[in-house]
Amino acid sequence: MRNRVLAFLAAAAGVLIPFVPLSAHHGSAAFESGKSVVMKGAVTRWFWANPHCFLSYDVKDESGNITHWVAETSNPPDMINRGWSKGTFKPGDEVTVTVEPVKNGRPAGRLLQVVLPNGKTLHSASPFQGPSN
């Protein structure tokens, strides 16, 4: 009986251990969950690739200083299901971006939604949020 229990535990550990790095990769500890920041900016780059897409954009403050922001979102197949595409943005597009900022204060965050120049709003479901409605 004891050998069966040990064999079961060893098999269970062998199956579960490879998933530990995945949960670390898809953790949300770096983000200020529940806090959102809305800003207007100009797109500098739309990086459309696995495992995550990234939107880079410049935000100008009241004094004219520019801060370069980067927002992470989900993978292309998830984004396609939400109406996004590789051609959603082009450099220079003026957009309104909503992110959950990172905790360390850097100009980065998890992309929640974007209002496009034509007024259309696109919602993002990052790997941490699950599907949007």
Model-derived features with residue positions:
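Short boundary/loop segments of OB/S1/cold-shock single-stranded nucleic-acid-binding domains
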Residues: 23-37
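Short aromatic-glycine-enriched beta-strand elements
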Residues: 49-59
